């Protein structure tokens, strides 16, 4: 037992190489009692060292002094101050200082090697890793940074104080770090501790690399990865498709369109001339050059083949439907519109009779020879569908 209340832990170097690090593991588990056992630490140089047995007398989770008992000799020291240090012996003069920054010295050298396994609280998985420290022979004092794994969002500072008596190779520990009590995950952020060692030159110390097996390290909670869903497992988007094609044998297709279908119709023209009104040029799907050339070719073909059957160029600009106008209905539409427009003084009345001749032999736009004329459909139904008057057509 050190007079200053410090546990004294010393070790001797491996026989193979003093710089060969030995591997030690610190486990933080749910158990507060450490059974007596003998552990071997094997370094890369095949140096095997026996570790003394310890048994925990009280709970580590409290902030009062706790004691680890073993079966070795009692050690004495000259200070009675409570500090946060672990003192070692080596041929180098080192000083290990914790966060409180207090330094003490030791006077005894007849100290054997000890290793303390530690279990704190109810943590079932390890939460920290100690880095390898390799002392060189030409450095007197040096700050050693020990970093831990970033395992959470909360910031926890280690302010533990190591005190007590080293009786029969026993050590006392007070103020264990306040680790979270969750078993599934550790909520602890990065914290650093500065350590210095102050040891006599007649002893040798081998600082070990305390590591934790990879299988026991819990994943950091903040490193959450978004799982990409399987594209093949996604449900196919349902798209409602409406087939609005007019069947050849459906003679009442034009008359049976509902009011909800009428709102999509914006322009509906019957064109047979090369000239169109300048105000309606934006309604055509062709450019100015293509429109003029296409219309000229159309009119030339009509002029050369007047005896043949002519079809009506039916344009539904910005419309979603293809309309089929029977020949009889088209003829009746033109004759009726000619009578009404002759009574009004407009510029369009003179051009109406010119369309009667192509309409007399009109076939459907689909050019189907088996198409049946719809004798039950009248021009009134067509205009009710379009909600327009005959004189509004640009002919």
From Swiss-Prot:
The modification Phosphoserine is found at residues 273, 319, 376. Keywords: Calcium, Cell projection, Cilium, Cytoplasm, Cytoplasmic vesicle, Flagellum, Membrane, Mitochondrion, Mitochondrion inner membrane, Phosphoprotein. InterPro entries: Ca-bd_spermatid (IPR026118). The modification Phosphothreonine is found at residue 287. It is found in: Cytoplasm; Mitochondrion inner membrane; Cell projection, Cilium, Flagellum; Cytoplasmic vesicle, Secretory vesicle, Acrosome. GO terms for molecular function: calcium ion binding. GO terms for cellular component: acrosomal vesicle; mitochondrial inner membrane; motile cilium; sperm principal piece. The keyword Transferase does not apply. GO terms for biological process: flagellated sperm motility; spermatogenesis. It comes from the Eukaryota. Pfam families: CABS1. The keyword Calcium applies. Residues 337-348 have a biased composition (Acidic residues). Residues 1-20, 335-379 are annotated as: Disordered. Calcium-binding protein. Essential for maintaining the structural integrity of the sperm flagella. This is Calcium-binding and spermatid-specific protein 1. It comes from Homo sapiens (Human). The gene is CABS1.
């Amino acid at each position: 037992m050190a007079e200053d209340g410090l546990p004294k832990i010393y070790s001797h170097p491996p026989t193979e190489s003093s710089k060969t690090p030995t591997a030690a593991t610190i486990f933080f588990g749910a158990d507060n009692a450490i059974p007596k056992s003998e552990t071997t630490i094997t370094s890369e140089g095949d140096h095997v060292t026996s570790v003394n047995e310890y048994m925990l007398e009280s709970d580590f989770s409290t902030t009062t002094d706790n004691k680890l008992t073993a079966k070795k000799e009692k050690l004495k020291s000259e200070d009675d101050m409570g500090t946060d240090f672990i003192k070692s012996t080596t041929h180098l003069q080192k000083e290990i200082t914790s966060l409180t920054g207090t330094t003490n010295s030791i006077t005894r050298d007849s100290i054997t090697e000890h290793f303390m396994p530690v279990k704190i609280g109810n943590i079932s998985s390890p939460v920290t890793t100690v880095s390898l420290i390799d002392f060189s022979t030409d450095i007197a004092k040096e700050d050693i940074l020990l970093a831990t794994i970033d395992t959470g969002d909360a910031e926890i500072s280690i302010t533990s104080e190591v005190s007590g008596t080293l009786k029969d190779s026993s050590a006392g520990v007070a103020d264990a770090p306040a680790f979270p009590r969750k078993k599934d995950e550790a909520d602890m952020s990065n914290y650093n501790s500065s350590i210095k060692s102050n040891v006599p030159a007649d002893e040798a110390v081998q600082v070990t690399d305390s590591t934790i097996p990879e299988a026991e390290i819990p994943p950091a909670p903040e490193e959450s990865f978004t799982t990409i869903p399987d594209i093949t497992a996604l449900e196919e988007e349902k798209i409602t498709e409406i087939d609005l094609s007019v069947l050849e044998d459906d003679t009442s297709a034009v008359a049976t369109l509902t009011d909800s279908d009428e709102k999509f119709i914006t322009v509906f023209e019957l064109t047979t001339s090369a000239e169109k009104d300048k105000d309606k040029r934006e309604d055509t799907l062709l450019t100015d050059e293509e429109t003029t050339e296409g219309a000229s070719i159309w009119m030339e073909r009509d002029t050369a083949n007047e005896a043949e059957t002519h079809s009506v160029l039916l344009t539904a600009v910005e419309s979603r439907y293809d309309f089929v106008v029977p020949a009889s209905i088209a003829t009746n539409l033109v004759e009726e519109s000619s009578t009404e427009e002759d009574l009004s003084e407009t510029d369009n009345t003179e051009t109406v009779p010119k369309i009667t001749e192509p309409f007399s032999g009109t076939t459907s736009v689909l050019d189907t020879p088996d198409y049946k004329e719809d004798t039950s459909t009248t021009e009134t139904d067509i205009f009710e569908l379009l909600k327009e008057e005959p004189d509004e057509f640009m002919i």
